[in-house]
UniProtKB/Swiss-Prot annotation:
Subcellular location: Cytoplasm
GO cellular component, one term: cytoplasm
Keywords assigned by UniProt, alphabetized: Cytoplasm
Keyword RNA-binding: no
InterPro entries: Endo/exonu/phosph_ase_sf (IPR036691), Endo/exonuclease/phosphatase (IPR005135), UPF0294 (IPR022958)
One Gene Ontology MF term: catalytic activity
Species this protein is from: Klebsiella pneumoniae (strain 342)
Family as reported in the entry's similarity comment: Belongs to the UPF0294 family.
Designated name of the protein: UPF0294 protein KPK_4510
Length: 265
């Protein structure tokens, strides 16, 4: 779906900018431009949340309070309403959204809010084979204070499919980028891993990419058929804290993870 795949970048005081996918991945690590570090302190705080197109009240309160001081906010089903765009540009330097579903007024898709401008941005889309509804993903890269480059993958995985072929297909271009990235990685979002075959495909992908799963001691993540839908995977970092907020502001509960730049335990 490369033809209709792009990201929209929202920055305070500037018109929205369309970002096209970079050229074909040539099997080598791209040369990134210089940039400002994502965080100036020793922690990287990441909020992950399927925001349900902001259809319920209190979504903004959750972002402001539970996500306070987050360096990255990875939203799924984010609809670019004036309220969300205003929140994003008032609290973050850059917000990049990949429109998956173009609704009559405001497109919906994954959106990554960041305290620094990304030095790399690659939007991705995959169409669900049954309902023909696209799902989106976004790969961005940010400098860290220790001079390493953090790759961030925000994904909303396909939901309705027979078997896991399309599910696995959506992960392939993400895997290409992670495999050629030598620095730390965070991959998070709504993976729709509601069946054993989907879980197996996801965990197999994580193993192949040398990604670890963030564990939540009080695991209140949204479930379907007894299986969690939202995950955070990482590489080249260590987890300092991880929590889930129980809320009615969406049909998913947001995840908050605090990373340290050091190596995993």
């Amino acid at each position: 779906m490369r033809k209709n795949t792009y990201a929209m970048r929202y920055v305070a005081g500037q018109p929205a900018e369309r970002i096209l996918p970079p050229g074909a991945f040539a099997g080598v690590s791209p040369v990134y431009p210089a940039g400002t570090p994502l965080s100036s302190d020793e922690k990287i705080r990441v909020l992950v949340w399927n925001i349900f197109k902001q259809q319920r009240a209190e979504w903004q309160s959750v972002l402001k309070n539970f996500g306070k001081d987050a360096h990255l906010v990875l939203l799924q089903e984010a609809q670019t309403t004036p309220e969300l765009v205003r929140f994003a540009t008032s609290n973050y330097l850059a917000a990049d959204q990949v429109p998956a579903l173009v609704l009559p007024q405001h497109p919906s898709g994954v959106m990554t809010l960041a305290s620094a401008h990304p030095i790399y941005c690659c939007p991705l889309r995959e169409r669900e084979p049954i309902l023909r509804l696209p799902k989106s993903a976004l790969v961005t890269v940010y400098p860290l204070p220790d001079a390493r480059l953090l790759m961030v993958v925000n994904i909303h995985a396909v939901n309705f499919s027979l078997g896991v072929d399309v599910y696995s297909k959506q992960l392939l271009p993400i895997g290409d980028q992670i495999a050629h990235h030598s620095g730390p990685v965070i991959m998070a979002g709504d993976f729709n891993a509601w069946s054993r075959p989907r879980m197996n495909a996801l965990y197999r992908f994580a193993r192949e990419m040398s990604l670890r799963e963030v564990r939540f001691s009080d695991d209140q993540r949204r479930r379907a058929f007894g299986r969690p839908l939202d995950f955070v995977f990482y590489r080249g970092l260590s987890v300092h804290d991880a929590s889930v907020l129980v809320t009615r502001a969406s049909d998913h509960n947001p995840l908050l993870v605090e990373f340290s730049p050091g190596k995993p335990d």
